[in-house]
Amino acid sequence: MAEFRSGFVCLIGRPNTGKSTLTNALVGTKVAITSMKPQTTRHTIRGIVHREGNFQIVLVDTPGLHRPRTLLGKRLNDLVRDTYTEVDLIGLCIPADEATGPGDRWIVNQIRSVAPKTILVVIVTKIDKVPKDRLSAQLVAVSDLVADSAEIVPVSAVTGEQVDVLIDVLAAALPPGPAYYSAGELTDEPEELLMAELIREAVLEGVHDELPHSLAVVIDEVSPRAGRGDLIDVHAVLYVERPSQKGIVIGKSGARLREVGIAARRQIEKLLGTNIYLDLHVNVAKNWQRNPKQLGRLGF
């Protein structure tokens, strides 16, 4: 009988390369925020892929590695680099529909510098978005980028194509080890953090590019409704940096915030398996990304 294999896998790449969507596809449920806006993942969220008697893959979903412009950006990059050295395998995500460039080379150099002994697998994402000839050209470019030093797996997290192949490749590269989590667990993140991420995802749909970096969500209180065993009250505060951003989030006569509340409530009800009442408030915390005290208060 083959030895049980287990370990930690870090999915990295430039912002918006499909890391969070891939995490959700591998796990089979939503555990990571998947907005189309760059740099939307703030916390290291672990998803767990378990095959009874065979293997367990613990996925670590990090923010996109980038050249930082704010104190928050620097802290996010530090989080990514710390993760590199603590995992068994790094999965570098490169999208099939974007040419490789200086940003990808910079990340490859960071990996080789910080974690030269960690196994590297290159995952070419979003293959459903390109024709076969363009995919072939991208695979050649990616091979040149890593100088044939890593296995390359093309996948589509949206259609599911090659996802099982990727799981097998990741599992085969892990060392023999125990199951770190029980078979029923899909993530080890607290429910309040997952709720905050789902609210952020709802806010970020269809807004201007500057807002993702300026938005933080804090769950203020979660409590059962008195006399209603089937209803939970969730109170959350959305923090932005400028009054103009507050206007974007709220919208004309509160219309935008109501849309956010409806979308987020549906996702949170799926997460909790019960009805919820979602109460949202928007506050301005001026320049919170550059203020160490504000960062600490908001969980960074």
Swiss-Prot record:
Residues reported in the UniProt entry to bind GTP: 13-20, 61-65, 125-128
Era-type G domain: residues covered: 5-176
Region: G5, residue numbers: 155-157
KH type-2 domain location: 207-286
G4: annotated span: 125-128
Gene Ontology MF, one: ribosomal small subunit binding
GO terms under cellular component: cell envelope; cytosol; extracellular region
Region G2: start-end pairs: 39-43
Alphabetized SUPFAM superfamilies for the sequence: P-loop containing nucleoside triphosphate hydrolases, Prokaryotic type KH domain (KH-domain type II)
Region of interest: G3: 61-64
InterPro entries named in the record: G_ERA_dom, GTP-bd, GTPase_Era-like, KH_dom-like_a/b, KH_dom_type_2, KH_sf_prok-type, P-loop_NTPase, Small_GTP-bd
Region of interest (G1), ranges: 13-20
Primary residence: other
Subcellular compartments: Cell envelope; Secreted, Cell wall
Keyword field: Cell wall, GTP-binding, Nucleotide-binding, RNA-binding, Secreted
GO biological processes: ribosomal small subunit assembly
Functional summary from the UniProt entry: Exhibits GTPase activity. Binds RNA but is probably not involved in ribosome assembly in mycobacteria.
Protein family: Belongs to the TRAFAC class TrmE-Era-EngA-EngB-Septin-like GTPase superfamily. Era GTPase family.
Subunit description: Monomer.
PANTHER family hit by this protein: GTPASE ERA (PTHR42698), GTPASE ERA, MITOCHONDRIAL (PTHR42698:SF1)
Protein name: GTPase Era
Species of the source: Mycobacterium leprae (strain TN)
Gene name of the encoded protein: era
